[in-house]
C-alpha cells in the first residue's frame, strides 16, 4: 500500500504539474460571465501545502505560480499553467483546464487517467484563489492551495 501511495504522489508531483507543458493562448470572452472570468487572467503566486504526509509521504510543500488565460471561444473555462519555484526559478508542472462557475465563484478541474483520479477545487475570493487537491472517488485531501493575483503584471 505504501508503494502505491509513493507512486501516486510521484505522479501528482511529476504528472499533475508536468504532464502538459503546452501554453494556452487566451482572449477576453464576451458576456457577463465572460467579464467575470476575464478578471482571472494573469499571474497568481502562492503556496501548495501538503496536508496528509502519512498517506502521501513523498508530498512536498511548494511555492507556486499559476498563469491563467481564457481559451479562445470559451466563456466558462480558464486554462492554468502551473509552475513550482525550485531554487528560485520556475519549473513547469503542467497545464489544466478549469470550469468556472460564476454563481458559486469556483474553478474546478478533474483529472483522470489509468493511474490516478483527482480533483482541484478553487474558490475565487477577489484577488485570491483558495482551495484543495483531493483524490477521487474517496475525496482524500492531499493539498491546500492559496494564491494571490499579481496586479503588477496586469498594469501597463
Regions found by a protein language model. Give the residues of each.
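Edge beta-strand at a domain terminus
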Residues: 27-31, 65, 91-97, 102-106, ...
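Short beta-strand segments that buttress and anchor functional surface loops
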Residues: 46-48, 79-84, 107-113, 131-135
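N-terminal glycine/threonine-rich, aromatic-flanked beta-hairpin/loop signature
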Residues: 56-95
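N-terminal secretory signal peptides
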Residues: 36-68
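Positively charged n-region of N-terminal signal peptides that target proteins for export
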Residues: 1-4
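Bacterial N-terminal signal peptides
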Residues: 8-19
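N-terminal helix-cap/turn-to-beta initiation motif at the start of protein domains
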Residues: 27-45, 70-72, 153-155
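Boundary at the C-terminal end of the N-terminal hydrophobic targeting segment
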Residues: 20, 24-26
Amino acid at each position: 500500500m505504501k508503494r502505491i501511495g509513493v507512486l501516486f504522489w510521484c505522479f501528482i508531483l511529476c504528472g499533475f504539474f508536468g504532464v502538459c507543458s503546452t501554453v494556452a493562448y487566451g482572449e477576453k470572452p464576451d458576456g457577463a460571465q465572460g467579464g467575470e472570468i476575464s478578471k482571472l487572467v494573469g499571474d497568481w503566486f502562492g503556496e501548495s501545502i501538503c496536508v496528509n504526509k502519512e498517506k502521501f509521504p513523498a508530498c512536498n510543500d511548494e511555492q507556486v505560480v499559476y498563469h491563467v488565460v481564457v481559451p479562445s471561444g470559451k466563456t466558462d473555462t480558464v486554462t492554468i499553467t502551473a509552475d513550482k519555484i525550485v531554487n528560485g526559478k520556475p519549473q513547469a508542472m503542467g497545464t489544466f483546464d478549469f470550469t468556472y462557475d460564476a454563481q458559486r465563484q469556483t474553478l474546478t478541474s478533474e483529472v483522470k487517467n489509468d493511474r490516478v483520479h483527482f480533483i482541484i477545487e478553487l474558490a475565487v475570493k477577489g484577488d485570491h484563489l483558495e482551495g484543495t487537491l483531493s483524490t477521487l472517488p474517496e475525496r482524500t485531501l492531499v493539498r491546500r492551495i492559496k494564491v494571490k493575483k499579481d496586479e503588477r503584471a496586469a498594469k501597463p
